[in-house]
Structures are given as C-alpha cells and as structure tokens.
Amino acid sequence: MTPAHKVLLCILDGWGIRQERDNNAIVLAGTPHLDKLASPYPFTELQTAGLAVGLPEGQMGNSEVGHTNIGAGRIVYQDLVRINRAAESGELAQNPVLRAALDGVKADGKALHLLGLVSPGGVHSSMDHLFALLKAAKERNVAHVYVHAFLDGRDTPPQSALGYVEELERFLHETHTGRIATVTGRFYAMDRDKRWDRVHQAYEALVFGRGPKAPDALSAIRASYAEKVTDEFVKPTVLAAGDGTPVGRIQDGDAVIFFNFRADRARELTQALAFPEFKEFDRGGLRLGRYVCMTQYDETFKLPALFEPDQPQDIFPELLSRQGLRQFRTAETEKYAHVTFFFNGGREVVYAGEDRHLVPSPRDVKTYDLKPEMSAYEVTAELVKRLDSGKYDFALVNFANPDMVGHSGRLDAAMKAVKAVDECLGALGKACERNGWVLAISADHGNCEQMVDLETGEPHTAHTLNPVPFHLIHPDFRGQKLRPGILADIAPTLCKVMGLPQSKEMNRQGLLP
C-alpha cells in the first residue's frame, strides 16, 4: 500500500516539560530550530511515568519502558509490576526455576551469589525483589548467601547509596539471610557499550577478590566519597576480613542469580560470568554450577530466567511490515537497542522491510558531559540521506544526548546537548519538508529539564515524572487540536496519519480527534 503520509518519528531521550527556568537545560539553552518548526502546528503533552506506562504509581519512566509503549500502541505492563506482584503474593518463592537453583546449590554445598543494583530507582532493579530472594533462600535452607551490591547514582541522587546499603545491611542482620561481599559502581558492573575493561574490573572483584579492600560496605562507600567518587563510579571493592580474605568471592560450582529485571545493562556481565565461550578478557577458567537471570536478558542467551518475556502482539512496526511498507531505524550505540529491540516489543527480530543503522557512541571520553554532542550529527547525516533516498515510508530516530548528558548532573553540558539536538532537528525539518514527510517529535521520559534536586540542592541525575511533548509537523495538520495523552497514544496517532488500519490490540484512540 501507499501511505497517506510518510512519517519520521524523533524521540528526544530525556526531554521533559517543566515551566521553571532554573536548572532547566532545555529552557536555558533555547531551542530556536524546534520553535520555528513546531510553532504553526499541533502540540500536546504525554504522560510517561507510573500507571500511564505500566509501572507502579509514582514510578518514573525510562527508555526501555517508553519505547516499548510507543511501539505497542497500548499500555504494556512492565516486568517491575509483574515481579512486584509475584514477590508480594509469595509466587516468587514458589517459582520452579528459583526453587531448582536454591535446592541445587544446597545439595552441592556451594554458595549462592545475588548480583544486582541495590537501589530504589526502580529502573533496573528493586530492593524488594532482592529481599524476597533472600527470604526464599533462607526458607530453602541455603547456608552460604552473598550479595554483590552494585551502586546507582544515575536513577538516584549521586551520593545516596549509604542509606540504601544500610537498609540492606539491616535486613541481612535482622533476618540472618546473608552477607554483602562486594560493592561496585554501576559504571563497571552494568556497562552496555562493550567497554570490557570496565566489566573486567568488576569481574576481578567478584571472582578473584582483587581490587580495593574494605571491612564493610558502608566503609567502602565512605572511602569513595572521601575521594570525591560518587555512587556510580565506586571502584569494584572487595569486603574482606582483617587478614585480607574476601567475604565471599564467586567460585567454581557456585550459583549466581542476577536480580536486575532490565536486560540491557545486565548482558555484558552475564556473558563474562556464564558464557562457555568468551574472548574479551581472561576469566581464569571459572565454571559456575548455575546462573539464573531475573528476566530473559537476550533471546540468544541459553540461560534460565525467573520471568519469561510478556511480549505485546500486533505492534506498530509489525503492522508496517504486514502492509508492505519500508521502515528505517537509527540511533547511536547508547540508544540503539531502544529503537530496535524495545520498539519491536522486546523481540530480537528484524521485520520484513525494516532497515537499521547503528552509529557508534563516542569512546574517547569517560562520560558524555565531556562530549555533549555525542554522535548526534552523525546520526542526523545518515538519517537525512535515508529520507532523501525515497526508499522508506517510516523512520524512527532516537537522540540520546538529553538523557545521557542529563545523567551527569552537569547543567552546562546538558545545555550544550540540547543545542546540538536542536540543530539536528533543524536539519531534519528541512529534509522532511523537501520530501513531503510528516515530522513527529516526542520523548520517552524527562531528565534534562531538571538538573538540580529541588529538595537537596544536589545535582539531579535521574529521570523525572514530568510529561513530554508531542509535536505533529506538516501543513496538512495545521490548525488541528491534539488530545493530551500517554506514550501508547503515539502509534494509533501515526496509524491515522499514515492511513493504516489500527490493530485491535492497539486499544488506545490516539491523539487526533
């Protein structure tokens, strides 16, 4: 079929709406290109957090959740909600995969290691899930249980780990369910950009007990703060007795459960610990007894998971493919999974008629505040070429800058990131105009519109609960009104714009009247 309109959907990652100017990188930077493009055309606000995207009430959204909802055209209830319900009801403790792992490690007389992000952020993990796993291990009489605590500082304030780790230590002491064995910033343990040198340092601490030593977790964190190293960047630290013996390193035959429910930042460490073949660094011949993921981290990983994927059917990209339309996806490395895997409903699939292009994120800087433009200009150049080719009917692009630089807490850098993305929008607006495309601009969640925590005065490095914009830019829609909505309204809206039949499973009415 021939669509009524061809559409470019731009997702400005971490670009929320907040009216106040103070510490608002978007307002302070100014967006002259976006303002010029969007001013004559319809605009509305979309909710991106809590129940609106299938998360618990008051829980901030994230890129994984956002892109899944955008592609599905309905509210997709997230793993966090599913696992919360299982933990609260006792269903988790009866999970057959969990019981097999616990009974196996007990029978073997080996240790159980629980790895994951100790954080209330709710983006990658939940402390309630960790507590439920610890209780289950005690109920199954597992004798040796160790927690390897990864510290946040991105989805939480940058120096907030002491409170969360103290809560964990209190729980462990009161319930006699285990001990903390290592403390590591997520910068090392949760890389997703193939920076294997970081993962290697985490592995060395987990498996060999190598790295800085500390008598307990709180001392390790305080020592890092004294060196002006915040939670995210705490070096992999081994908790050890007075003679230097590690509290609990991962050894041959042990069992590991990675309790992060979000996949993208759990994959690399999982590969290092559990894959039979691995060539990125010398692992020293570790052979685990069991390795269990909280969720399915990748369809190609032949590893058991406590919760299998709940994948939405008849989603927007699938609809495009069935109609014989050509689609193009692009982003830089940091957000490439979001415009592919997550937009495709959590599937490792390339639909018929779907082309992709990955632009590498910068690797010459440690953090992106040092290069706020990241790879936005390269992404834009490739996308303009594809729009001008006349080959496609739909295109999706994600600009990572507002989110990735926003996570640094550096207002000046975030403003530069905003300016770079605004320039790119100007170029894309011109390309859409000369090719007759509709330009739809939105975001998956907020971030850089609030760079300082209003309560503490510290840098704000997490996502926000703020709504995000939705612009529909094309002369055919001048003067039309858009309803306020949620991210799941985007796909039904694009179906109407393109003249496509909306699937029954897309149960949202969209934003157009």
Curated annotation (Swiss-Prot):
Cofactors: Mn(2+)
Q: What is its EC number?
A: 5.4.2.12
Query: What positions does the entry give for substrate binding?
Result: 124, 154-155, 186, 192, 262-265, 335
UniProt-recorded Gene Ontology molecular function terms: manganese ion binding; phosphoglycerate mutase activity
Q: Which chemical reaction does it catalyze?
A: (2R)-2-phosphoglycerate = (2R)-3-phosphoglycerate
The lineage's top-level taxon is Bacteria
- Similarity remark: Belongs to the BPG-independent phosphoglycerate mutase family.
| Protein name as catalogued | 2,3-bisphosphoglycerate-independent phosphoglycerate mutase
Say which species the protein is native to. Myxococcus xanthus (strain DK1622)
